[in-house]
Amino acid sequence: MKLPTEFAQRQRLADELHARPFESVATPGAVLSVATLRGSPAEDAACLAHLALLQPGAPAAAATATHLSLRCGAVRVRWERHTEFYSFTFISDTGPTELAGCLDADWLNALPAGWLAALPGPMIAATQIALLPCPGEPPHVRSVAPVFGSEVLVGNRVADGAATVVTDLRSVQGVTRFLVFDHALNRRRAGRIAQRLIELDTYRMMALLSLPVASKRMGELATEEEQLASLMNRFRAASDGDEPLLAELTDLAARVEHAMANHGSRFSATQAYRGIVDRRLAEMREQLVPGLQPLSEFLDRRFRPAMESCAAASARQAQLSERIARAAQLLQTRAEVERERQNQALLASMDKRQGLQ
C-alpha cells in the first residue's frame, strides 16, 4: 500500500502517546521520585551527564531526549524532562513485608555515593512509596501511625478497592511518604497507582509555586487600586490640566502590565497543575476507610484555598488592568474635548479679528 508523503513530525506525534508508559512495580517494593526545577535548557545536558554516571561506558543518550530508563544494580531509574522540572524515579522490586522499617531507604545505597544529593537543579518535591502485601483488611490506623510518627493520617481505598493508600502528607526531611497496602494488584496496576501518587505530590508542589507570588501581588494590588481611585477622584475634581493625570495613569498602567508579564505565566501554570492534581485524584477512584480522612477531602480543605488565592490574584490583576484602560480612555477623551474647545475658541477669535479689519 503506497501512501502520500508523511508530514515531517507525524511519527513523533504518533509516538507521543507511548512516550511515557507507566513503570511496573512489584509488591513488596519501594519507589522514590525526586523532582528538581529546570532552570534553563543548558541543564538538560547536565542531567544526561549525571545519569551517565550510573552506567559508565554505555552509549550516550540523545541531547534532545525527554525521557530515559536505565538500571543501576537492582534499582531501576527513570528520568523525564518536563517544561518546568525534571523527575527522577527510582524503583526497587524488593522491600519489607512488614510495617516495621517499611519506609527505610537502604535500597538506595545501590546508587553511587553522593549521586542522589548532586541531582541538577533545586528540589521541589520528593515522594517515597512503600508497597506492602496485604491480602486482607489494611492494618488499623493506630498501628500505622508510628510508621509516620503522626496521629493525623489521611488515605482511602483506591483502584476499586484493590489497594489502600495511607499518608500524612507531611514533608519529613523534604520527603512526602505514602504506604500502599496491596490487596489485589498486579505489577502494572501497582505502577499506575505509584505514578499517580507521584504526580499528585509533584504537581501539588508545582501548583503552589505561585502562592508566594500571589500573596506579594495582593499587597501590591491594594496599593495600585488606591492609586487608581485617587487619580479618578482628581480627574472628577479637575476642570483642566489632564496631562499630569494622564502621565501618572500611564506610569501606573506600565507597572501593572509589567507585573502581568512577569507573573501571568506563573498563574496560568498553576491552573494547569491544579487540573492535573484534580484528575489524578479522580483516577484513583477513592473509597472510604474507617478512621481515615479521605485524601481528596484533605486536599480540598488545604490545597484548594491556596489555589483560589492564586486565581483571585490573577483575576484581580486582570480587572485592574481593564479599569486602568477605561480610565485612560476617559482622560484621553476629555483631553481631546478640551483641545477641540480651545481650537474652536482660537478660530472664533481669529474670525473676530478678521471682521474688525
Predicted regions and their residues:
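Short acidic (Asp/Glu) and glycine-rich catalytic loops that position anionic groups and cofactors
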Residues: 30, 201-202, 299-302
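N-terminal pre-transmembrane cytosolic regions of membrane proteins
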Residues: 1-130
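Structural beta-strand/beta-sheet cores of well-ordered domains, especially the beta-sheet scaffolds
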Residues: 30-32, 84-86, 174-176, 308, ...
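N-proximal short alpha-helices
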Residues: 3-7, 14-16, 24, 183-197, ...
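Extended alpha-helical interaction modules
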Residues: 91-250, 254
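Membrane-associated alpha-helical segments
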Residues: 252-357
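Exposed alpha-helical structural elements
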Residues: 12, 46-50, 189-193, 244, ...
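Short, well-structured alpha-helical interface segments that form or flank functional binding sites
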Residues: 74, 83, 212, 219, ...
